[in-house]
Amino acid sequence: MKLDLLTAISPIDGRYRGKTDVLSAYFSEFALIKYRVQVEVEYFITLCELPLPQLKGVDKGVFETLRNIYRNFSEADAQRIKDIESVTNHDVKAVEYFLKEEFDKLGGMDDYKEFIHFGLTSQDINNTSVPLSVKEALEQVYYPQIEELIAQLRTYAEEWAAIPMLAKTHGQPASPTRLGKEIMVFVYRLERQLATLKACPVTAKFGGATGNYNAHHVAYPEYDWKVFGDKFVSEKLGLEREEYTTQISNYDNLSAIFDAMKRINTVMIDMNRDFWQYISMEYFKQKIKAGEVGSSAMPHKVNPIDFENAEGNLGMANAILEHLAVKLPVSRLQRDLTDSTVLRNVGMPFGHIIIAIQSSLKGLRKLLLNEPAIYRDLDNCWSVVAEAIQTILRREAYQHPYEALKALTRTNQAITEVSIKEFIEGLSVSEEIKKELRVITPHTYTGI
């Protein structure tokens, strides 16, 4: 079958393609090839800028023309590289041969072609291309979308800042809180973890076949290739070079990025489950869209499907991120090939995360606050003011206040406003203290 939205194996490229297609520019096979071309071109230019003696004749005016090879990179170019790979059976070598063909088209570059991929191993290209794709996907796709989600949560937190709400710990009534504050918990958590993610350095491996610049040093011992590599990776790619490596990246910092993303996902799972629960408790209703169906059998159903979709996709993302984080830093001796196939899946968790963020936003924007349901729960749970009463009584050195409130409230009998007021009136305290206690209600006992 021809590959399209209906025949794609992964729902990321099929059912959810409309949400994830933006990631193709970073994580598709086309994108990986393009990033490889970019790294190879910039490396050649940097050798010319050094300059190596044999490259002094390269006209600097050709640099922008060379950069246009990757700036204007087309699907036809990518296909040409795949055609070359079908012969070489080596993807990075195919990029090198493609660039030599492009040099031939320019003319006057024949003497310089052998400095394409000079002294490098494939992982000098892969372990710069992949981190660069991750960095740009984070900056251009992920950060804007997660920040949009945080902004939506903050809007609700501010809008509903004064709405009192019965808290639940262990699934049971607890001291009242405020709806806006509970949403602000997620704003706070997401912002903190996002800051941690942004602080993670994006690093790259660039140092030859076993990380020692052997080939560079034997050919040109007069140059400090470590300084060269640091400058190239930093100035041309915007990454940080890992100073000590084997043939491949240590992947420790990439793993840190994946772990940080996983923590953010975990916060989002918690958030989605809470909103799902609030809908189940009828604290929120959902906007109804004409024509939509909630169940094939039950016509009345309006399900919290967006929050469920988000939770499921975040779970998938975390499972993949976990494997990436624990597998990539482990490689036999100076390297084995297990990282290669794993790295090709870096875009997968990004896809699931983007789907989840958009589903979360969709669910949040369908919410309709149902204040009567929230207030009804508060009115039906006067036992939660027991903490307030016993705390004030402790302040006044009243004897055994906790035990007195426990005897009143820890029963299977309903605790009502009347029973609380009767308890207050029976206390051996001043009228001033009783007045202080009388104004405490489940609606007002919400802290600061």
Q: Language-model features: where?
A:
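Active-site-adjacent "gating/activation" loops or surface patches in catalytic cores
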Residues: Y223-Q247, Y251
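Alpha-helical coiled-coil oligomerization motifs
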Residues: E158-A161, V202, W276, Y283, ...
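A helix-coil-helix interface module used to build multimeric assemblies
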Residues: M1-Y213, Y220, D224-F232, G294, ...
